[in-house]
């Protein structure tokens, strides 16, 4: 199974434990892109709505495309009652949007699953002149606030983390947008924090793509090791989060 499809196997766990984003990030994004009633927005791969509520509640014409069938159904059950909510179950790479164009296209930890050339050329074509492309992600630091626990967790990874296929972190070039016609590229950062118990940390760790598919006999030993490490540290692990927002704009007069 492709890594980008494995999240669909854990919709409830994904919904509960994947990180949300800071209110400040959304305030800036909504203001920068001018999102509100009368504006059309497309979210790429919303998952179960980790970045959906603040945009949907602006009253914009909200659209989403979700690859996973179970994630799609979860989104429909959560937001189907909103009159401005529309979602399709499909693959952005191949989906035909027809003549529809958007004032903003945004992604919360999704666009990196799309080949760069397709990601930027297709979003560029789908945006109206002056439209905004927004890409957000979370970087969690659990080393700084839990140094001893961090070292213990690294021992667990060294002993038992044996995925059948490695996930290549950081391969997507967000600043590559400027190579495909986008202008005014910028990066903004916002601070946040999460605190997990041992059970919560194990459940959260189980939402990472390469952790979802971790095979036995390593899988049980790995997650048991994570659980015990946090229990021995007082049943508490802290993540100092950085929410990253990349913004780019389609020129009013595209070349």
Would you name each region that the model predicts?
Residues 124, 128-192:
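Conserved catalytic/acceptor-binding region of the Class I
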Residues 48, 165-166, 170-255:
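Conserved Class I S-adenosyl-L-methionine
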Residues 95-105:
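A short acidic, Gly/Pro-enriched loop at the edge of an enzyme's catalytic core
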Residues 109-110:
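Short catalytic micro-motifs in class I SAM-dependent methyltransferases
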Residues 113-123:
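A short, conserved alpha-helix within the catalytic core of class I
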Residues 1-36:
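Conserved class I S-adenosyl-L-methionine
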Residues 40-42, 48-95:
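Class I SAM-dependent methyltransferase SAM/SAH-binding core
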């Amino acid at each position: 199974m492709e890594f980008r499809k494995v999240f669909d196997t854990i919709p409830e766990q994904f919904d509960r434990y994947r990180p949300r984003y800071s209110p400040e990030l959304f305030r800036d994004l909504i203001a920068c892109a001018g999102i509100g009633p009368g504006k059309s927005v497309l979210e790429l791969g919303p998952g179960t709505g980790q970045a959906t509520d603040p945009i949907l509640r602006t009253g914009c014409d909200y659209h989403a495309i979700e690859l996973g069938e179970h994630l799609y159904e979860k989104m429909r059950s959560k937001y189907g009652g909103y009159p401005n909510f529309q979602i399709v179950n499909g693959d952005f790479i191949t989906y035909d949007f027809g003549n529809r164009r958007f004032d903003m296209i945004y992604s919360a930890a999704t666009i990196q699953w799309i080949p760069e050339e397709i990601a930027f050329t297709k979003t560029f074509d789908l945006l109206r002149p002056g439209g905004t492309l927004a890409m957000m992600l979370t970087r969690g630091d659990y080393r700084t606030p839990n140094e001893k626990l961090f070292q213990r967790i690294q021992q667990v990874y060294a002993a038992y983390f044996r995925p059948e296929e490695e996930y290549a972190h950081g391969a997507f070039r967000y600043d590559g947008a400027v190579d495909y016609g986008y202008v005014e590229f910028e990066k903004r950062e916002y601070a946040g924090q999460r605190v997990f118990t041992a059970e919560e940390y194990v459940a959260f760790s189980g939402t990472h793509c390469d952790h979802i598919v971790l095979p036995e006999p390593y899988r049980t030993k790995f997650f048991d090791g994570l659980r015990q490490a946090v229990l021995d540290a007082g049943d508490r692990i802290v993540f100092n989060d950085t929410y990253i927002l990349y913004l780019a704009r389609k020129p009013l007069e595209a070349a």
